[in-house]
Design a protein with these regions (language model features):
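Structured-RNA-binding interfaces characteristic of tRNA pseudouridine synthases
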Residues: 1-257
Length: 257
């Protein structure tokens, strides 16, 4: 488990940030050697603001190109700046595609990955004859006809506790591939927009994008809704559909239970 800091207990406080970002220009959340990330920008700007080395820990390490309305990060600091004021000062330093929605002090032993939580992701699809430029960074474009009823039927079969190994990127190192999905909704918004909304207690690497790719296959008639059961039973990545592109995915909400 990652440690937040080695600062003396009496001198530090722990601060939780709610972070929104457009992931288009970033190599994901986690620090990488080959590009700028959300985590590296937060560390850089917090270190500059608080005049001490700061390293944040993120609740969800989103992939390159994925967006967020409410990811969570925490860090320790000895600064006397009130926790609730940090959001205002930090937003003055961050790039315009990253914004802190809230900053607050939390108990010193609070850690985002040790808490029971509920995450909600949305995968957005734009269906039309031609692409819409203003949606190109946040929705997957398709000109295929999609049978939404078939997608909704298949989505319901994913709900509950299952072994989602077939929906996990090959090579991912995890102790268990069992997860609980509270709900999977396929919702039409207007004539052209379609949203796949998935809520669960945790997700495997690329799991939501593989779910989206599989539901798209079903919507196009390439698979039957009942194939979900066969895919789950296979426990093999090759049994599921393709991994949908990252730019259609947004982490909408992170709730601690």
């Amino acid at each position: 488990m990652e440690r937040l800091s080695t600062l003396p207990e009496k001198e530090k406080k722990r601060v939780r940030l709610t972070v929104a970002y457009d992931g288009t220009n970033y190599h994901g959340w986690q620090i990488q050697n080959n590009g700028i990330t959300i985590e590296s920008e937060l560390n850089r700007c917090l270190t500059d603001l608080l005049r001490e080395p700061v390293e944040v820990i993120g609740a969800s390490r989103t992939d390159s190109g994925v967006h967020a309305l409410g990811n969570i990060a925490v860090f320790d600091t000895t600064s006397r700046m009130p926790a609730e004021k940090i959001s205002y000062a930090l937003n003055q330093r961050l790039p315009e595609d990253i914004r802190i929605q809230k900053s607050e002090q939390v108990p010193q032993d609070w850690h985002p990955r040790r808490c029971d939580s509920r995450k909600t992701y949305e995968y957005r699809i734009y269906r039309a004859q031609f692409p819409m430029p203003v949606k190109r960074l946040y929705s997957l474009f398709t000109y295929y006809e999609l049978d939404v009823n078939r997608m909704q039927e298949a989505a319901a079969y994913l709900e509950g506790e299952h072994d989602f190994k077939s929906f996990c990127q090959t090579g991912a190192q995890v102790e268990s591939t069992v997860r609980t999905i509270y709900s999977v909704e396929v919702e039409e918004q207007g004539e052209n927009d379609l949203v796949i909304r998935v809520c669960g207690n945790g997700f495997l690497y690329n799991m939501v994008r593989i779910i989206a790719g599989t539901l798209l296959d079903i919507g196009q008639g390439k698979r039957d809704p009942m194939d979900i059961f066969t895919i789950l039973e296979a426990k093999d990545r090759s049994a599921a559909g393709p991994t949908a592109p990252a730019h259609g995915l947004t982490l909408v909400k992170y709730e601690f239970l």
